[in-house]
Amino acid sequence: MTRVALAFSGGLDTTVCVSLLKEEYGYDEVIGVTVDVGQPATEFEEAQATADAHGIDLHVVDATAEFVDLCFDSVRANATYQGYPLGTALARPIIAESIVSVAKAENCDALAHGCTGKGNDQLRFEAVWRNSDLTVIAPIRELELTREWEQEYAAEHNLPVQAGNDGVWSIDTNLWSRSIEGGKLEDPNYTPPEDVYEWTADPATTTETELITIGFESGYPVSINDNAHDPVELVETLNEVAGEHGVGRTDMMEDRMLGLKVRENYEHPAATTLLNAHKALEGLVLTKDERDFKRHIDSEWAQKGYEGLVDHPLMDALEGFIDATQQRVTGTVTIKFEGGQARPVGRESAAAAYSADAASFNTSSIGEITQQDATGIAKYHGYQGRIANAATETDTK
């Protein structure tokens, strides 16, 4: 008996895939796998209902803790891609690994997903899956199916498809972000209606302000207002608190890996808050040279994270540098929520690379260094440029 493990949500794509894997690919049994990375409970209920109607076994894997751990690694790397905090991208390798584990435990011959041939997720899933000895199947891509064809196929075969949000938008939710795309949003000039947002209040209507303090240890968020939280609880709390102030909305034209531009809307209140706080603490603790060089490292980490290549050998090297810098990133940051913003307004650390006395306008010297000692440096500063400019002026006369 041949058996295939399908990444299963209960939506149109994966529901159609169940039938296609049997009819077109000849598999005897399809096993559905749904991985919990912080989706709403209704999504699991819908997946189970669809699986039951299809008569297939559904395995639900809780990978929430592993996912948030990876998100916290991304905080240490200040990781965003074109301005958004990588929630969807980071979830995919976690989901893919979980599906491989189930497939091996259930003696499956193959792995399957319902991704199209136009998106990023096919690449992220398969980057993980092709490390296994299992066959990889992508029915939607391989059979070149369209959404319209799938809808007709489901209707003709009376397939159980959960309505979800009635197909108005394509929505993907996890603890780190909520993405909204498709439908009228495919028009770059279309203004999203306020009801597409669920996590964040309208920033234009939020009038209250609130201060919170976030604690970090070695670059990892560990507390809110001096109360320790486990990673999952900390993110859940900040999503609620920051979301009430309208924090964490992104409306962007995203450049996908295949070269396509796509209109995306994201909500990510906790991610925005933690990234802003972490950058503020690094600004207090790290030297200028460390901060300048780390920007390059962070950018590479974010790119690999966006591509779903979190196990790439380069990531080990990047993590080595990041880990070395983060040993001193311990302290607290005060964040002010106001008008859709999460703004750092205070930071404190025993490892601060900062001297209030040295920076003060009320002191004339720094130890043995006086203000007059800067005169020689000031004379040399820009000297090469002045010579070059003078030579250019001479040549043009």
Curated annotation (Swiss-Prot):
**Intracellular or extracellular location(s):** Cytoplasm
Record-level Gene Ontology MF annotations: argininosuccinate synthase activity; ATP binding
* CDD domains reported for this sequence: ASS (cd01999)
Q: Say yes or no: keyword Cell cycle present.
A: no
Q: Which reaction does it catalyse?
A: L-citrulline + L-aspartate + ATP = 2-(N(omega)-L-arginino)succinate + AMP + diphosphate + H(+)
PROSITE patterns in the cross-refs: ARGININOSUCCIN_SYN_1, ARGININOSUCCIN_SYN_2
Q: What is its EC number?
A: 6.3.4.5
What residues does L-aspartate bind to? 116, 120-121
- Pathway membership of this protein? Amino-acid biosynthesis; L-arginine biosynthesis; L-arginine from L-ornithine and carbamoyl phosphate: step 2/3
Sequence positions that bind ATP: 7-15, 114
Q: What class of enzyme is it?
A: ligase
What biological processes does GO assign it? argininosuccinate metabolic process; L-arginine biosynthetic process; urea cycle
User: Looking at the UniProt record for this protein, which Gene Ontology cellular component terms does it annotate, in alphabetical order?
Assistant: cytoplasm
According to the lineage, what is the superkingdom?
Archaea
Q: Where does L-citrulline bind?
A: 84, 120, 124, 170, 179, 254, 266
Which keywords belong to this entry? Amino-acid biosynthesis, Arginine biosynthesis, ATP-binding, Cytoplasm, Ligase, Nucleotide-binding
PANTHER family with a match to the protein in the record: ARGININOSUCCINATE SYNTHASE
Q: How does it assemble?
A: Homotetramer.
Say which family it is in.
Belongs to the argininosuccinate synthase family. Type 1 subfamily.
Protein's UniProt name: Argininosuccinate synthase
Q: Which organism is it from?
A: Haloquadratum walsbyi (strain DSM 16790 / HBSQ001)
Q: What is the lineage of its organism?
A: Archaea, Methanobacteriati, Methanobacteriota, Stenosarchaea group, Halobacteria
